[in-house]
Structures are given as structure tokens and as C-alpha cells.
Amino acid sequence: SKTYSITGWRLGYTIAPEEITERIKKVHDFLTVGAAAPLQEAVIPGLRFGRDYYDELLKTYTYKRDLFVQGLDAIGLEHTTPQGAYYVLMDISRYGYKSDLEFCEMLARDVGVGAVPGSSFFREDVNYLIRFHFAKKDGTLHEALNRLEKLKKL
């Protein structure tokens, strides 16, 4: 889903001997529902992309990551700097909210920036992180950073 900027889509494949493939199919049937036929068709062109596509994708995501994390740094917000993900986790513990969901609701309502509660991604009781997705247009990232400046006043 990250490689082709289709976040949320889940599709995978295996290449294996027939006897292993039969076992994989049995396990797969118990764990998932099938990927939608349009999704399966949509991924075919992506499997044919050459190395240049992936090199350019790396440059693009690295640029967007750096743009966003440098903006967060300039505002003084604590965050992770991902090495391979298309999102940044920001530490909200200094704001005193009881939950990351509560903070995300305030952020959307009062600041005009959407984020996902980090607790959605942890088995442990982690409620002091929120997740920003940076695979966006540059203008969207700049606008989000401008709006996040409001957090300085909290």
C-alpha cells in the first residue's frame, strides 16, 4: 500500500513450490477475506514498474518526510523521524490530554489538522502519540505546518 500510495489497501503475493502454496492458501483463507478484484487488477501495472520508479519514489518520500519533520522541529514539536514509513508519530504528552483520541478531536476541531490516535497502532496502552501521514501534496504539508503553529499557544 505504501509503495503505490494507496494507503489502507492490503495486497500481497507469494512465490513458492506448489505444496507450500497449497498450505499458504489454507492459512490465508482462515486469516483474510479476498482482495477485491479491482485491487488485484490495479496492482498489475505496479509490478511492471522499473527501478527508476522506485528510486524516484524514495526521493519523493524522503523530501516530503524531511519537509514535514523540519517543519515540526521549527515549531518545537517532539516527533519520530521515520526511516521507511510514510508517517510521523508526534508526542503529545506535554499537552495534558487524557487520551490521544481526545487530542486528535481537538486538533481537527480547533487547529484544522487531521491526525490518527497512535493508540490505534499499539497493543500496549500507548496514548501519548498521534500519527501524521506525510505522503501529501507539498502545499497540504505547508498548510498543516502553518496550522500546527497554533500548538505553541497551548
Q: Language-model segments: which ranges?
A:
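PLP-dependent class I/II
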Residues: 1-154
